[in-house]
Amino acid sequence: MFELNEKTAVITGGGSGIGKAIAQLFARQGAHVHVVDLNDAACLQVVREIREDAGRVTSHACDVARQADVKALMENIGPFDILVNNAGIAHIGKADTTSEEDFDRVMSVNVKGVYNCLHAAIPQLRANGGGVILNMASVAAWVGIKERFAYSTAKGAVMAMTLSVAKDYLQDGIRCNSISPGRVHTPFVDGFLARNYPGREAEMFEQLSKTQPIGRMAQPDEVAALALYLCSKEAAFITGTDYPIDGGFITLNT
């Protein structure tokens, strides 16, 4: 079950964290994985690790916020079956403390970046007889996160795009779903703690973990496992749906 043999998958934000875990798992399940990330060095490291595991993988440095670059990337990759829109950035701030520049930056990557990938990928998926799109939303789209105004807004848009795409391209054989993670222990979290709480990283990590009802953060591999299911033939009857993976966060905050 959950095999991706003979499938080609494009994964944005694949250089670290959740995207890296998805790329590694998809490759282990037989897919030819195209890892896309703004950080070329991170891409190459993922490629090395996947090839050491005998996986098929190609790396691409690309800024998803630049439509022309994304279009060229998709054309260069050629026919593919799966698109995972995972690239994104975070920002801390309320509506009145978020600058226009920061708001635009978050929207450019988290919303326009997804749009750019959809715009370039859907014609290829349609021509290929269909495929699967998986967008990375967030619990922030469901409940809003305190002092994450721009991020919550952007992820709400991603969830809306998921619904729209699922409806518009159902007859083309394209399925589209999204995942809404809660807190996930990624290098981003470690970097955030190191920058903001030097010397107190372990203490603050424990505090952040306790904000999750289940008592810990998710691991990237857990999110990747859900992504694999949704992109496999076993999920062929599922489209237009968001899947929280949040340790009970949404249930206890709505």
Labelled PLM ranges:
Residues 8, 15-17:
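Conserved glycine-rich cofactor-binding loop
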Residues 66, 178, 186, 200-234, ...:
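C-terminal helical subdomain
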Residues 94-95, 99-105, 208:
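Substrate-binding pocket helix/loop in short-chain dehydrogenase/reductase
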Residues 138:
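Residue(s) in the substrate-gating loop at a strand-loop-helix junction
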